[in-house]
Amino acid sequence: MSNPNYKIPIKEWIVSERPRELLLSKGPEHLPDAKLLAIILRTGNKEETAEDLARRLLNTFGGFTGLYRASVEELLQIKGMGKAKAAQVKAALEIGKRFLQNETVEEARITTPEDAIEYAARYFSSMLMNEGKEHFWILLLDRKNRPIKHVEISVGSSIQTTVDPKEILKQVSLTSAQALILIHNHPSGDPSPSREDVAVTKQLKQACELVGAQLLDHIIVGKNQHVSLAREKLI
């Protein structure tokens, strides 16, 4: 007697329909989200294929952003997700995040608030605008105002984060940075600077001047919006 819930394993699908073979023949950019995630999951179970499980995960958490923010414990509550699959998913998403963090603009120079906003929009918007907690970053620049690297300094709550000036000065020293830009997000989606944002920025600017580094700007990332404290003349 056949099992009505039995799903044909992906390895028995027509070759042209298998996620991995599709990626190899057409390229990853042509695969829908569920097929990409199915490649990470590798296997399903007797009741659903890896692609079915992938689609259910994406629907449950609202896409890759929600999946990234989900904890391992939350993933394990999903039927069909064991520790190995949860680890595979979290590792793959973390790799994507780190790629965005480490990518830099070749020969880019940041000399105006508009340059700073453009950089933040390109490298931080997708990463920070849907975060549920405040993340505080610094972008370190060389003597020609070209990006050296960006570093996450702290992660706080949904309404604030604590910044240690010593950690920022340490990064300035390690990279011999001549200038820097502060970047953090407002989980509420409203990038309007608070009094605390302005006060902390001024304190950090004074601290940086003590070691010969210039704090050029502080960019606040909101929901598809950015505010430059330098452009608003708040520094």
UniProtKB/Swiss-Prot annotation:
Q: What protein name applies here?
A: UPF0758 protein COPRO5265_1522
Q: Which UniProt keywords apply?
A: Hydrolase, Metal-binding, Metalloprotease, Protease, Zinc
Give GO BP annotations, semicolon-separated: proteolysis
Q: Where is this motif: JAMM motif?
A: 184-197
User: Which Gene Ontology terms cover its molecular function?
Assistant: metal ion binding; metallopeptidase activity
* Family listed: Belongs to the UPF0758 family.
The record's listing under InterPro entries reads: MPN, RadC_JAB, RuvA_2-like, UPF0758, UPF0758_CS, UPF0758_N
User: Matching Pfam families, A to Z?
Assistant: RadC (PF04002), UPF0758_N (PF20582)
What positions does the entry give for Zn(2+) binding? H184, H186, D197
The residues covered by the MPN domain are: 109-235
State the organism of origin. Coprothermobacter proteolyticus (strain ATCC 35245 / DSM 5265 / OCM 4 / BT)
